[in-house]
Amino acid sequence: MSRFAGPNTGAAVSALPASIDETLALLKGAGYVADRSLATVLFLALRLQRPLFLEGEAGVGKTEIAKVLASALGRKLIRLQCYEGLDVSSAVYEWNYAGQMMAIRLAEAGGGVDRARLEGDVFSERYLVKRALLQALEPDAGGPPVLLIDELDRTDEAFEAFLLEILSDFQVTIPEFGTVKAEHPPIVIVTSNRTREIHDALKRRCLYHWVDYPDAARELAILRAKAPQAPAKLSKEIVAFVQAIRKEDLFKSPGVAETLDWASALVELDAVALDPHLVSDTLGVLLKYQDDIQKMQGSKAKELLDSVRAEARR
């Protein structure tokens, strides 16, 4: 049981989807166009109360899934952005040492210090600074939050090992305080860009899904949902060009996020269709490495664009 007092959890909580189709509709209603395989694993993660591990290239929409899910369910989103060197004090908890020292000095100044009682007081919730992972275990009137552990591959194996208790039992053990266990498990989404392999022990505690680049039909649906101001012809050409450029030998292929950014940029330029000069001039929105940009500029941009248009006429 949680050691934290929380708000009345009897308040109305947004219902979880009762089927895969409802999961698809929930995501679509919040502006996320998912395929059925993603909706299936998300539905199962919600029903089985298991963490969901999403792996895939940067920019394919992994983080957005957690954001959309929290919004659609009316739940709080708690995000832990991972980075190299992330440790327990930044991700889970730390003690308010200044407050503890002040309490000790005041007690000693008053005389007759009960050491056991003083120790219990300074290691109480009053002096516990709760970080993202600990906050996610607390009761919430709006229902269990969505906990996003984003880009786990940026951390090290020691931090992965610490996460095992949270992902398997939804609890954290604090040596001076005790075990804090969620009364109702949070909805946990873990993402990785696969810059390194994540240990099997962590993956076994989660349901797994590889988030791939969308096919042309789904990417067009995403573009129309996120950038409805883009002309229909331009939207089709953008998607066809991006789909084609992903087949090229690039250091980093553009993700869906770059597709949307490019569409927004082209709309700002009052474009109604692509042309080679426009493509070359705006490649910096779509591609993020100079070698890739140089490879795709000029005659290569025209060649790809001609190929895309020829394919569209078939």
Predicted segments with their positions:
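C-terminal regulatory/interaction module of P-loop NTP-utilizing enzymes
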Residues: 1-314
